[in-house]
Amino acid sequence: MDGVKEWFNSIPPVSRYMFAIFLGIPVLAAMHLISFNYLYLDFTFTFKHFHLWRLITAPCIISSLGPMFLFNLIFFYQYTTRLESLNYAGKSDDYLFCIIFISICNIIFGLIFEYYFLGTMTIMSLIYIYSRMNPTGTSNFYGFFSFKTIYLPWVFLVAHFLQTGHPPYSDFLAIVSGHIFFYLTDIYPRANGVPALIKTPKFITNIFNKGDRNPNNVRRDPRTGRPIQEGGYNWGQGHALG
Protein backbone atom coordinates (compact mmCIF):
# COMPACT_ATOMS: atom_id res chain seq x y z
CA MET A 1 0.00 0.00 0.00
CA ASP A 2 2.90 2.32 0.78
CA GLY A 3 4.26 1.62 -2.71
CA VAL A 4 1.00 2.68 -4.32
CA LYS A 5 0.89 5.84 -2.21
CA GLU A 6 4.49 6.64 -3.09
CA TRP A 7 3.80 6.09 -6.80
CA PHE A 8 0.66 8.24 -6.70
CA ASN A 9 2.43 11.08 -4.92
CA SER A 10 5.25 10.94 -7.48
CA ILE A 11 2.85 11.92 -10.28
CA PRO A 12 3.02 15.65 -11.12
CA PRO A 13 0.18 17.53 -9.37
CA VAL A 14 -2.20 18.32 -12.24
CA SER A 15 -1.76 14.87 -13.78
CA ARG A 16 -2.23 13.26 -10.35
CA TYR A 17 -5.63 14.78 -9.72
CA MET A 18 -6.74 14.38 -13.32
CA PHE A 19 -5.79 10.70 -13.20
CA ALA A 20 -7.73 10.28 -9.96
CA ILE A 21 -10.82 11.89 -11.52
CA PHE A 22 -10.55 9.88 -14.76
CA LEU A 23 -10.33 6.66 -12.74
CA GLY A 24 -12.62 7.62 -9.88
CA ILE A 25 -15.73 8.54 -11.90
CA PRO A 26 -16.27 5.12 -13.58
CA VAL A 27 -15.29 3.27 -10.39
CA LEU A 28 -17.88 5.19 -8.37
CA ALA A 29 -20.42 4.67 -11.17
CA ALA A 30 -19.73 0.91 -11.14
CA MET A 31 -20.37 0.95 -7.37
CA HIS A 32 -23.65 2.81 -8.02
CA LEU A 33 -22.51 5.73 -5.88
CA ILE A 34 -22.90 8.18 -8.75
CA SER A 35 -24.65 8.06 -12.12
CA PHE A 36 -23.32 9.07 -15.53
CA ASN A 37 -26.77 10.59 -16.10
CA TYR A 38 -25.76 13.52 -13.92
CA LEU A 39 -22.29 13.96 -15.40
CA TYR A 40 -22.44 13.88 -19.20
CA LEU A 41 -22.50 17.00 -21.37
CA ASP A 42 -25.98 18.18 -22.33
CA PHE A 43 -26.96 21.71 -23.29
CA THR A 44 -30.38 21.68 -21.63
CA PHE A 45 -29.24 20.22 -18.32
CA THR A 46 -26.06 22.30 -18.22
CA PHE A 47 -27.38 25.74 -19.10
CA LYS A 48 -31.14 25.63 -18.56
CA HIS A 49 -31.08 23.57 -15.36
CA PHE A 50 -27.73 25.01 -14.28
CA HIS A 51 -25.91 21.68 -13.93
CA LEU A 52 -22.67 23.58 -14.44
CA TRP A 53 -20.59 20.79 -12.93
CA ARG A 54 -21.13 18.89 -16.18
CA LEU A 55 -18.64 21.30 -17.80
CA ILE A 56 -16.03 19.83 -15.43
CA THR A 57 -17.06 16.18 -15.39
CA ALA A 58 -17.73 15.62 -19.12
CA PRO A 59 -14.10 16.24 -20.22
CA CYS A 60 -12.97 13.69 -17.61
CA ILE A 61 -15.25 10.79 -18.58
CA ILE A 62 -13.77 8.17 -20.90
CA SER A 63 -16.36 5.42 -20.57
CA SER A 64 -17.58 2.84 -18.11
CA LEU A 65 -15.07 0.29 -16.82
CA GLY A 66 -13.80 -2.14 -19.44
CA PRO A 67 -10.81 -2.98 -21.67
CA MET A 68 -11.08 0.17 -23.79
CA PHE A 69 -11.34 2.30 -20.67
CA LEU A 70 -8.14 0.71 -19.35
CA PHE A 71 -6.25 1.31 -22.60
CA ASN A 72 -7.36 4.95 -22.75
CA LEU A 73 -6.50 5.49 -19.08
CA ILE A 74 -3.00 4.13 -19.70
CA PHE A 75 -2.56 6.46 -22.68
CA PHE A 76 -3.77 9.40 -20.61
CA TYR A 77 -1.37 8.57 -17.78
CA GLN A 78 1.55 8.17 -20.18
CA TYR A 79 1.16 11.42 -22.03
CA THR A 80 -0.12 13.70 -19.28
CA THR A 81 2.77 12.76 -16.99
CA ARG A 82 5.29 13.21 -19.79
CA LEU A 83 3.90 16.61 -20.68
CA GLU A 84 3.80 17.91 -17.14
CA SER A 85 7.14 16.46 -16.03
CA LEU A 86 9.08 17.32 -19.21
CA ASN A 87 7.54 20.10 -21.29
CA TYR A 88 5.81 21.77 -18.36
CA ALA A 89 8.40 20.98 -15.68
CA GLY A 90 7.96 23.53 -12.89
CA LYS A 91 4.99 25.05 -14.74
CA SER A 92 2.00 23.05 -13.55
CA ASP A 93 -0.10 26.22 -13.61
CA ASP A 94 0.54 26.58 -17.35
CA TYR A 95 -0.31 22.91 -17.82
CA LEU A 96 -3.58 23.30 -15.94
CA PHE A 97 -4.43 26.27 -18.16
CA CYS A 98 -3.62 24.13 -21.21
CA ILE A 99 -6.09 21.47 -20.06
CA ILE A 100 -8.76 24.07 -19.27
CA PHE A 101 -8.35 25.70 -22.68
CA ILE A 102 -8.57 22.49 -24.71
CA SER A 103 -11.50 21.35 -22.55
CA ILE A 104 -13.39 24.55 -23.39
CA CYS A 105 -12.73 23.97 -27.10
CA ASN A 106 -13.84 20.34 -26.84
CA ILE A 107 -16.95 21.34 -24.90
CA ILE A 108 -17.91 23.74 -27.69
CA PHE A 109 -17.45 20.96 -30.25
CA GLY A 110 -19.34 18.57 -27.98
CA LEU A 111 -22.32 20.91 -27.72
CA ILE A 112 -22.38 21.49 -31.49
CA PHE A 113 -22.03 17.83 -32.50
CA GLU A 114 -23.73 16.27 -29.45
CA TYR A 115 -20.77 14.46 -27.91
CA TYR A 116 -21.66 13.60 -24.33
CA PHE A 117 -18.46 12.10 -22.89
CA LEU A 118 -15.33 14.05 -23.77
CA GLY A 119 -12.59 12.14 -21.96
CA THR A 120 -11.14 10.58 -25.11
CA MET A 121 -11.15 14.02 -26.74
CA THR A 122 -9.13 15.38 -23.81
CA ILE A 123 -6.61 12.58 -24.29
CA MET A 124 -6.35 13.12 -28.05
CA SER A 125 -5.84 16.87 -27.61
CA LEU A 126 -2.99 16.23 -25.16
CA ILE A 127 -1.45 13.64 -27.48
CA TYR A 128 -1.49 16.20 -30.28
CA ILE A 129 0.12 18.88 -28.13
CA TYR A 130 2.76 16.39 -26.99
CA SER A 131 3.52 15.44 -30.59
CA ARG A 132 4.04 19.09 -31.55
CA MET A 133 6.25 19.83 -28.57
CA ASN A 134 8.39 16.74 -29.14
CA PRO A 135 8.26 16.33 -32.95
CA THR A 136 11.66 14.66 -33.41
CA GLY A 137 11.22 12.11 -30.64
CA THR A 138 10.42 8.45 -31.24
CA SER A 139 7.13 6.85 -30.20
CA ASN A 140 5.71 3.37 -30.60
CA PHE A 141 2.18 2.05 -30.83
CA TYR A 142 1.39 -0.94 -28.62
CA GLY A 143 5.06 -1.85 -29.04
CA PHE A 144 4.49 -3.00 -32.62
CA PHE A 145 6.32 -0.30 -34.58
CA SER A 146 8.18 2.95 -34.01
CA PHE A 147 7.75 6.31 -35.72
CA LYS A 148 8.47 10.01 -35.26
CA THR A 149 6.38 11.49 -32.46
CA ILE A 150 5.02 14.18 -34.77
CA TYR A 151 2.87 11.44 -36.38
CA LEU A 152 1.51 10.13 -33.07
CA PRO A 153 -2.01 11.65 -33.15
CA TRP A 154 -2.52 10.51 -36.74
CA VAL A 155 -1.52 6.96 -35.84
CA PHE A 156 -4.13 7.04 -33.08
CA LEU A 157 -6.67 8.44 -35.52
CA VAL A 158 -6.14 5.56 -37.96
CA ALA A 159 -6.12 2.99 -35.15
CA HIS A 160 -9.44 4.23 -33.80
CA PHE A 161 -10.95 4.03 -37.27
CA LEU A 162 -9.73 0.45 -37.71
CA GLN A 163 -11.02 -0.52 -34.25
CA THR A 164 -14.49 0.96 -34.61
CA GLY A 165 -15.09 1.08 -38.36
CA HIS A 166 -16.48 4.60 -37.96
CA PRO A 167 -14.86 7.89 -39.02
CA PRO A 168 -13.12 9.31 -35.91
CA TYR A 169 -14.74 12.74 -36.10
CA SER A 170 -14.43 13.46 -32.38
CA ASP A 171 -10.74 12.54 -32.42
CA PHE A 172 -10.14 14.91 -35.31
CA LEU A 173 -11.99 17.73 -33.53
CA ALA A 174 -9.86 17.07 -30.45
CA ILE A 175 -6.77 17.50 -32.62
CA VAL A 176 -8.22 20.81 -33.81
CA SER A 177 -8.61 21.89 -30.17
CA GLY A 178 -5.01 20.97 -29.45
CA HIS A 179 -3.83 22.78 -32.56
CA ILE A 180 -5.67 25.97 -31.60
CA PHE A 181 -3.88 26.01 -28.27
CA PHE A 182 -0.48 25.19 -29.79
CA TYR A 183 -0.94 27.80 -32.51
CA LEU A 184 -1.77 30.55 -30.03
CA THR A 185 1.04 29.69 -27.61
CA ASP A 186 3.81 28.48 -29.91
CA ILE A 187 3.41 28.58 -33.70
CA TYR A 188 2.24 32.17 -34.15
CA PRO A 189 4.48 33.70 -31.44
CA ARG A 190 7.53 31.80 -32.71
CA ALA A 191 6.89 32.77 -36.34
CA ASN A 192 6.35 36.45 -35.56
CA GLY A 193 8.67 36.99 -32.61
CA VAL A 194 5.86 38.08 -30.30
CA PRO A 195 4.52 36.92 -26.93
CA ALA A 196 2.00 34.10 -26.77
CA LEU A 197 -1.51 35.23 -27.67
CA ILE A 198 -3.00 33.71 -24.53
CA LYS A 199 -1.50 33.41 -21.08
CA THR A 200 -2.21 31.58 -17.85
CA PRO A 201 -4.57 33.67 -15.70
CA LYS A 202 -3.13 34.94 -12.45
CA PHE A 203 -5.70 33.14 -10.34
CA ILE A 204 -4.51 29.79 -11.73
CA THR A 205 -0.88 30.68 -11.06
CA ASN A 206 -1.82 31.61 -7.49
CA ILE A 207 -3.15 28.09 -6.90
CA PHE A 208 0.39 26.75 -7.07
CA ASN A 209 3.34 27.54 -4.86
CA LYS A 210 5.58 29.38 -7.26
CA GLY A 211 8.38 30.13 -4.82
CA ASP A 212 10.91 27.82 -6.47
CA ARG A 213 9.48 27.75 -9.97
CA ASN A 214 11.75 30.29 -11.60
CA PRO A 215 13.46 32.91 -9.44
CA ASN A 216 14.08 35.22 -12.41
CA ASN A 217 10.64 34.54 -13.93
CA VAL A 218 12.22 33.48 -17.22
CA ARG A 219 10.18 31.39 -19.64
CA ARG A 220 12.23 28.74 -21.41
CA ASP A 221 11.84 26.93 -24.70
CA PRO A 222 10.78 23.34 -23.79
CA ARG A 223 12.84 21.97 -26.69
CA THR A 224 16.15 23.70 -25.88
CA GLY A 225 15.83 24.95 -22.32
CA ARG A 226 16.96 28.39 -23.49
CA PRO A 227 15.25 31.60 -22.29
CA ILE A 228 12.59 33.06 -24.58
CA GLN A 229 12.39 36.82 -25.00
CA GLU A 230 8.80 37.87 -24.53
CA GLY A 231 8.85 41.65 -24.72
CA GLY A 232 8.27 42.12 -21.00
CA TYR A 233 5.27 39.84 -20.67
CA ASN A 234 5.12 36.71 -18.55
CA TRP A 235 2.96 34.46 -20.69
CA GLY A 236 1.80 30.95 -19.93
CA GLN A 237 2.71 28.22 -22.40
CA GLY A 238 1.18 25.06 -23.81
CA HIS A 239 2.97 22.06 -25.27
CA ALA A 240 2.49 18.56 -26.57
CA LEU A 241 3.08 14.90 -25.78
CA GLY A 242 5.69 12.54 -27.14
UniProtKB/Swiss-Prot annotation:
Positions on the Cytoplasmic side per record topology: 1-18, 120-140, 189-242
Give the similarity note. Answer: Belongs to the derlin family.
Q: Which GO terms describe its cellular component?
A: endoplasmic reticulum membrane
User: What organism, scientifically named, is this protein from?
Assistant: Dictyostelium discoideum
Region described as Disordered: 214-242
Classification lineage: Eukaryota, Amoebozoa, Evosea, Eumycetozoa, Dictyostelia
The entry lists its GO molecular-function terms as:
signal recognition particle binding
Function text = May be involved in the degradation process of specific misfolded endoplasmic reticulum (ER) luminal proteins. May also involved in endoplasmic reticulum stress-induced pre-emptive quality control, a mechanism that selectively attenuates the translocation of newly synthesized proteins into the endoplasmic reticulum and reroutes them to the cytosol for proteasomal degradation.
Q: Which residues lie on this side of the membrane: Lumenal?
A: 40-98, 162-167
Give residue spans, biased composition: Basic and acidic residues.
214-224
Chief localisation class? endoplasmic reticulum
> In which residue ranges is the amino acid composition biased (Gly residues)?
233-242
Q: Which Pfam families match?
A: DER1 (PF04511)
**Do you know which InterPro entries this protein is assigned to?**
DER1, Rhomboid-like_sf
Which keywords describe this protein according to UniProt? Answer: Endoplasmic reticulum, Membrane, Transmembrane, Transmembrane helix, Unfolded protein response
Membrane topology recorded in Swiss-Prot or TrEMBL:
Multi-pass membrane protein
Where does it reside?
Answer: Endoplasmic reticulum membrane
Signal peptide location:
none
Per its record, how is this protein called by name? Probable derlin-1 homolog
Q: Where does the chain cross the membrane?
A: 19-39, 99-119, 141-161, 168-188
